[in-house]
Amino acid sequence: GAATLSNIYQGLGYDWIRHLTMWAATAVLLCYLGKIILYPSVAKGEYKNTVPASLYAGITMVTMILCSYYKDWAPGLARIILIAAVCIHAVHILVFLFNNVFGGVKLDTFVPSWFVTFNGIMVSTVVGAAMLPPFMAKAVLVWGLCIYTITIPFMVWRLATREVKPAFCHTQAIVLAPCSLCLASYLNLAQEPSMALVGSLFSCVLASLAFIIIKLPVFFAVPFAPGFAGLTFPMAIGIVASNKAAAFFTGAGQETLGYAVKQIAGVQIYLTTAIIGMVLFGFLKMLFGAGNKAG
């Protein structure tokens, strides 16, 4: 989430924020990879559980974002790693479907974190569409649009009719991510975007954003935990989607609508910066608190 937000701040002229955030994201990614290599039994145990398994897709998503950063210095290597990340993510989707869908879906663990696995692969078409082979980029877009369309009605029904366990509470915020990824990817790749489809996807973005804002008091009513990270990426990618939608509407002659959407994006930047700042501060407190106890 912070890495995506740093890209937005770079667009506003704040390059240093992007550099610092991407370096930090690189360190975090290396730590996660180190954990998998050094403690494979722990990673394997987590992967057997539905919700943690769905979140493992975050590793390839961060990799894709970092490829868009490092391509300025090593374009060939960044492209290879990006394509590899897409392929690994695709394999992860297949394994996840086999483990958690084909044998029957358990409603207690059917939560919005599934979209991290299902639609997270679309990070590649948001940040690096030009680096992907055209057929791969198109396949990712078609998959993302189809799986979101299929899954979201069931997810809305599930959230409306069944209580989400406290441990999975913050995963509810992830509903903003898939529609935002679909919208941003579609506008990146479509030569002549459909006004109806863009309008429909942006309506989903607005509805999801409203859902999160309504839920914020619930999300922050509990003590800080790693699950708060579920708030970060959806909020950040929502800004990207809104900015792209604003540019599309303006370019299509809908200046008033484009202006309104641009102002909504401004509110999103304001709110997302506050949320991500609070979450990062919470993680720093956990880190230094653990260090003090160890000392």
Model-assigned labels for residue ranges:
Residues 1-33, 289:
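N-terminal signal-anchor module of multipass membrane proteins
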Residues 1-4, 40-65, 82, 100-126, ...:
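Juxtamembrane helix-loop boundaries in multi-pass membrane proteins
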Residues 7-16, 68-80, 126-138, 186-197, ...:
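Helix-coil boundary and interhelical linker segments in multi-pass alpha-helical membrane proteins
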Residues 16-30, 75-90, 134-149, 195-207, ...:
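Structural signature of hydrophobic alpha-helical transmembrane segments
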Residues 35-43, 68-79, 97-101:
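Transmembrane alpha-helix boundary signature
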Residues 92-96, 126-129, 150-159, 181-188, ...:
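Alpha-helical transmembrane segments in multipass membrane proteins, preferentially the mid-helix core
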Residues 143-202:
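Aromatic-anchored, glycine/proline-accented short structural segments
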